[in-house]
């Protein structure tokens, strides 16, 4: 039984809108947004007694004249699922996270540049756990699939279907072979740790320097006094599968038991990234799951990414 009380707070969680040494307060961004004084004084060390963690979660956010600096060990500061488990054989291990983000993010692409995947992080949460929504799983046209380092044109999604099981927990996260715990979607218990699930909560920073919020935003993008709503992705499930899409899972490598099986089962729509299409204007967000608007931390407005409950769950591209 997992303990309901998981944390021993060692250091006070320091979040400040003022840079303590004044190094970034007077820094002006040219031609872009400024994030210079937002969440740049965080230093936290928490013991997570969850049976799958049993380690300190350590992370700090500071800044210099040009960059936001993250140092952490990638250990979650909240309850997690059981790891290893039947569909994920990996244990959570400390990482060495050192990342920098510009304090002056600028929109440079109208449609976004594809990034991320198992080889890299598209964003980091406040607790130094990375957001990495894609998987290395693929299938070929014959329905021969691998859960990791697969071959073929069809990219397997981690969430939103029952065909493939990557062993995710209640935070839509699991563990890579390196021991790195990472989010594929909504980090539910991190949101609870940071504040109310009904609020607009800043949960991290994207690699291009823009902020990341979870689920909610203002109904009027320009009005801090407007109601908080659940923001909708603009991606839709295709009504007709793409030509050549495999419909039957014939061979599975690295699935349950991590061996080779021959399921001969249907591959439901939504199991592949290619099963979705962007329909401009059908939701609240753009093709990178973001938008421009006011936020509690940026009352004058900024471009921000959103973690959503539906595909793509988190951005697959960056605009900065």
Q: Which residue stretches match the model-derived regions?
A:
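Sec-dependent signal peptide recognition
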Residues: 2-9
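C-terminal motif of bacterial Sec signal peptides marking the signal peptidase cleavage site
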Residues: 13-16
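Solvent-exposed N-terminal domain segments of exported/luminal and surface proteins
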Residues: 20-165
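Extracellular structured ligand-interaction cores
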Residues: 96-98, 119-121, 168, 178-182, ...
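Short loop/beta submotifs within extracellular cysteine-rich repeat domains
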Residues: 109, 190-193, 311-316
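Short, flexible domain-boundary/linker segments around small modular repeats
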Residues: 126-172, 258-291
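Extracellular/lumenal glycan-associated surfaces
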Residues: 126-129, 177-190, 298-312
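Extended, compositionally biased non-globular segments
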Residues: 210, 222-320
């Amino acid at each position: 039984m997992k303990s309901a009380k998981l944390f021993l707070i060692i250091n006070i969680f320091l979040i400040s809108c003022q840079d303590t040494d004044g190094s970034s307060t007077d820094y002006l961004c040219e031609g872009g947004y400024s994030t210079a004084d937002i969440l740049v004084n965080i230093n936290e060390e928490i013991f997570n007694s969850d049976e799958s963690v049993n380690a300190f979660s350590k992370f700090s956010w500071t800044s210099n004249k040009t960059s936001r600096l993250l140092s952490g060990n990638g250990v979650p500061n909240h309850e997690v699922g059981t790891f290893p488990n039947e569909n994920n054989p990996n244990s959570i291990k400390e990482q060495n996270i050192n990342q920098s983000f510009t304090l002056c993010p600028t929109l440079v692409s109208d449609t976004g540049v594809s990034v991320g995947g198992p080889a890299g992080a598209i964003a980091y949460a406040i607790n130094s756990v990375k957001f990495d929504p894609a998987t290395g799983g693929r299938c070929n046209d014959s329905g021969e699939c691998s859960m990791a380092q697969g071959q073929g044109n069809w990219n397997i999604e981690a969430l939103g279907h029952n065909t493939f099981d990557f062993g995710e927990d209640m935070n839509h996260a699991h563990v890579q072979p390196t021991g790195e715990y990472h989010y594929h979607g909504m980090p539910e218990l991190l949101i609870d740790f940071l504040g109310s699930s009904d609020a607009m909560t800043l949960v991290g920073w994207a690699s291009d320097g823009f902020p990341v919020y979870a689920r909610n935003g203002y109904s009027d993008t320009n009005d801090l006094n407007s109601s908080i709503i659940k923001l909708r992705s603009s991606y839709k499930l295709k009504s007709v599968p793409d030509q050549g899409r495999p419909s039957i899972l014939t061979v599975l490598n690295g699935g349950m038991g991590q061996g080779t099986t021959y399921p001969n089962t249907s591959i439901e729509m939504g199991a592949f990234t290619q099963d979705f299409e962007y329909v401009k204007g059908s939701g609240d967000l753009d093709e990178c799951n973001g938008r421009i608007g006011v936020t509690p931390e940026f009352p004058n407005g900024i471009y921000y990414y959103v973690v959503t409950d539906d595909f793509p769950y988190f951005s697959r591209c960056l605009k900065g």
